Amino acid sequence: MKKIAVDAMGGDFAPQSVVEGVEKARNKYPDLRFMLFGDEQKIREILTSDKNIEIIQTTEVIDMNDEPVKAIRRKKDSSLVRAAYAVKEGKADALFSCGNTGALLAAGLLIVGRIKGITRPGLLSTLPVLTKEGGAFNLLDSGANADNKPEQLYQYALLGKYYAESVRNIKNPRIGLLNNGTEPHKGSKLTLEAHNLIAADSSINFVGNVESKDILKGVCDVVVADGFTGNAVLKAIEGTAGTAMHLLKDTIMSAGLLGKIGGLLLKPSIMKIRNKMSASQYGGAVLLGAKAPVVKAHGASDAETVYYTVKQINDMLENDMLSKFTDYFNKNV
Amino acid sequence: MKKIAVDAMGGDFAPQSVVEGVEKARNKYPDLRFMLFGDEQKIREILTSDKNIEIIQTTEVIDMNDEPVKAIRRKKDSSLVRAAYAVKEGKADALFSCGNTGALLAAGLLIVGRIKGITRPGLLSTLPVLTKEGGAFNLLDSGANADNKPEQLYQYALLGKYYAESVRNIKNPRIGLLNNGTEPHKGSKLTLEAHNLIAADSSINFVGNVESKDILKGVCDVVVADGFTGNAVLKAIEGTAGTAMHLLKDTIMSAGLLGKIGGLLLKPSIMKIRNKMSASQYGGAVLLGAKAPVVKAHGASDAETVYYTVKQINDMLENDMLSKFTDYFNKNV
């Protein structure tokens, strides 16, 4: 029986979408338990049944404008900080929030804490492989760090491997290193050193360097990057996809009658593309290297996204991903 | 009267598209002169008139698989190396190729040479602002370097400013620094230092940090980045746009009869988006910081792209961009 500590107040549509998504997940996964941290009255207005759900009243909320580390230190009775302490104290097995990303990362690092041997936990995101039905890849670190060292990129290769095995059920996942060219001799000082470290570990199915133009085509299952570049690439992909969809919509709307009819006939197809590109079914971003799953879903998450993210957390807990991490790093570092 | 040294053999459709594009530009710009380096016989098979065009016979070609620096050193009679020497020796004012990017960069750095005071020239690319008709922005460095220092990013801010003023006729162009957040306190060691250097120069219209998700929306005219991140972002944007267009096409093709009719009715609109996203009318990538314009058009360039790239080179020469660079850096460095 595993328990998830949920920041019920984080996110644009909180607590509504969080509570609805949690209830849906509760109905699907009878072995899961939930601790909902937040404004009890507001939560109860939405909650239909408190089966397997415990509500913990908190009085503060960390919002999107709060400076992360400061907020974690000062808002001691916030839904996020209280949820993080529940994990730290062993009352819950995972931390989940749709709120301020920086604050969640800070709570993960400073309250939940790092696995011994992992110097800089990294944020793992899941993105769609656009050319393959249902395909996906992970990008790690997608932004927990602004500066990384080669050894940390090597650790991301290992963390990403265990994640892909545990949660995505991929045997021997293909690990690629994000670089400015595919040839082994190409790269920055950082990627050249990281390349050698990863290549030297025969337990990793290393496919070598990958370029950002190819990752959406599924050239590997896990893309390892430093947090600065990973973040820039993630946001470039999201920005381009979002802008392209807007452009398509605007173009159809201003295309005259025939164009509008065309748009109408194509609507189901365009919705299919939109869904493929949308993040909701791929779950949340995971801070890998923390002592427990620390998971962030998008601020604009609806109940569906919350549900899928709980499913993802359940996969991590069911397959005991954290024990695999700690076993490995306690033995090897 | 300005002269452009053209590598007529570089690119997927060379010399055909190169010669056709040059002739079109020759007809448009009577003050320009061209030196076409390559296989004279092949060039003459395409050339309709040699007015203002001189052909220089060369016997070697650097292809896409050649290792750049090695190729520059060994293939002394290649069309690219001979064209670069023409610039170095003052016989031509600019270097243009659609061939191997690395080799062109190496020729720019090692043969044409750097402007005094500029330690690491950067590659400037032009991308479309998707939300604004005809809008565009520059990204610099988009991949000439794998590792950059803060002072170099500051130099890119200056080089980008002069470029936008000279070629794009933008008064007081808005310069942004690519970063992992817009707040001034965010960033890597590199971007934090670069931010301070750029912000301290009151001659620069610095709009602060920009994120890769916003640059396609035109938040600034010039995006300054280190070459590794700039390259990753450029390729992520190109990869996402390309994959999205493919996905749209595939979805229409498999959408059944109504969907296909819809696709047909929408075809003009979709072509409009494609054109907006396509690189051809935005010209080539420019190695800024070299002693003369060193310009690379896409390997798959058609005659139209070659024509637009010559127009872009003409703008740089007409507005004497290089003198502005050298005046500034000779005075200030």
UniProtKB/Swiss-Prot annotation, chains A, B:
This is Phosphate acyltransferase. Pathway: Lipid metabolism; phospholipid metabolism. GO terms for molecular function: phosphate:acyl-[acyl carrier protein] acyltransferase activity. GO terms for cellular component: cytoplasm. Disulfide bonds: none annotated. The gene is plsX. Catalyzes the reversible formation of acyl-phosphate (acyl-PO(4)) from acyl-[acyl-carrier-protein] (acyl-ACP). This enzyme utilizes acyl-ACP as fatty acyl donor, but not acyl-CoA. Homodimer. Probably interacts with PlsY. Pfam families: FA_synthesis. Its EC number is 2.3.1.274. GO terms for biological process: fatty acid biosynthetic process; phospholipid biosynthetic process. It is found in: Cytoplasm. It is an enzyme of class 2 (transferase). Belongs to the PlsX family. Keywords: Cytoplasm, Lipid biosynthesis, Lipid metabolism, Phospholipid biosynthesis, Phospholipid metabolism, Transferase. The keyword Transferase applies. It catalyses: a fatty acyl-[ACP] + phosphate = an acyl phosphate + holo-[ACP].
